[in-house]
Amino acid sequence: MNSPATSNSAQTQSRKADHIRICLEEDVQFRATTNGLERYRFNHSCLPEIDRNDIDLSATFLGKKLNAPLLISSMTGGTEQAGIINQRLARLAQDYKFAMGVGSQRVALEKPQVADTFAIRKYAPDVLLFANVGAVQLNYKYGLDECLRIIDMLEADALILHINPLQECIQPKGDVNFQGLLDKISELCEELSVPVIAKEVGNGISGAMAKKLIAAGVQVIDVAGAGGTSWAKVEGERAENSMQRRLGRTFADWGIPTAECITSVRAIAPHIPLIASGGLRDGLDIAKAIALGADIAGLAMPFLQAAVESEAALQELAEVLIAEITTVLFCTGNATLHQLKHSGSLQRLQ
């Protein structure tokens, strides 16, 4: 007979495999809710007065220099396919000096033999790497020791605590006790020597919530707003009964659009390191997010789709994103990301 721990680890590993399959094969994108960036437009400069070849996309984040303001957002781990994906993404991050986060490492604590699917530091020795676990696990017997093991597993520069109440509501046997979680996040922030990143999973962090998280000691906010992959839809596809499937459909478009998250968080925290993610699909989206106040931008689905195809597809995606961001800067007359952010080039449409 399997022990409860063995059963839990098998369920977690199966869930990870399901997530990859569903994201790649099913329509799990937001429909009625967009990322909100379409409400903004850059003012075109017909005389940029700069050489496109001199444009500098570099950014410094958490003390590390990135060649472009890009984060390969948290996606996967814990299965053989996930291990291959993470290796490919890590090599890309190393080659292009992007930041990278992995998917939840809970599965590797429950099943240590899959920890190697997260062991990517050897492929990305110079990359800004983020470890990852669900914040709610702090209410389910996880604490400092487990978080340190997760960080050490990746040799990570920071720890993502992903916050996903809606997903847990729809996920079969989800962990839904969020009571007192902010205090536990605060305690963990005090005890860890690496920065803690608070990240939603596609439903957004408001300015009011960011204020509480920052007061608790969180050092980075990743807004992960609505408009991209709907985890309500994903979990609805996995649902074991009609009620959960109904919940997935009902809340498929629930969340705060990414653009609103960026502006509201930046308004209450002018200097907090801020990551924009949630439905960003190209370099124009990334440039808009930076102009709205983000420091770097995270993409997950585009990198996942390319990684499953080939390393060549990943390289092509990276080159396209860089070219798109560069073109925005050139056609708005800005030579650096700092200039773009403070240029007033981005206008909200009426």
From Swiss-Prot:
* Primary enzyme class: isomerase
Instruction: Report which superkingdom the organism of origin falls in.
Output: Bacteria
HAMAP family for the chain: Idi_2 (MF_00354)
Report what the protein is called: Isopentenyl-diphosphate delta-isomerase
Q: Where in the cell is it found?
A: Cytoplasm
Kindly give the InterPro entries that the UniProt entry links to this protein: Aldolase_TIM, FMN-dep_DH, IPdP_isomerase
Q: Which CDD domains match?
A: IDI-2_FMN
| E.C. code | 5.3.3.2
The residues that hold FMN are: S73, S74, M75, T76, S104, N132, K199, T229, G279, L280, R281, A300, M301
Q: What is the lineage of its organism?
A: Bacteria, Bacillati, Cyanobacteriota, Cyanophyceae, Nostocales
The cofactors it requires, by name, are: FMN; NADPH; Mg(2+)
Q: Which reaction does it catalyse?
A: isopentenyl diphosphate = dimethylallyl diphosphate
Member of which family? Belongs to the IPP isomerase type 2 family.
Q: Where does substrate bind?
A: R15, K16, S104, Q105, R106, Q167
Question: Quaternary arrangement and interactors, per the entry?
Answer: Homooctamer. Dimer of tetramers.
Any one Gene Ontology MF annotation carried by this entry is: NADPH binding
Q: Which GO terms describe its biological process?
A: isoprenoid biosynthetic process
SUPFAM superfamilies given in the database record: FMN-linked oxidoreductases (SSF51395)
Q: Which keywords does the record carry?
A: Cytoplasm, Flavoprotein, FMN, Isomerase, Isoprene biosynthesis, Magnesium, Metal-binding, NADP
Q: What does this protein do?
A: Involved in the biosynthesis of isoprenoids. Catalyzes the 1,3-allylic rearrangement of the homoallylic substrate isopentenyl (IPP) to its allylic isomer, dimethylallyl diphosphate (DMAPP).
Chief location category: cytoplasm
Quote the record's binding site residues for Mg(2+). E168
GO cellular component annotations of the record: cytoplasm
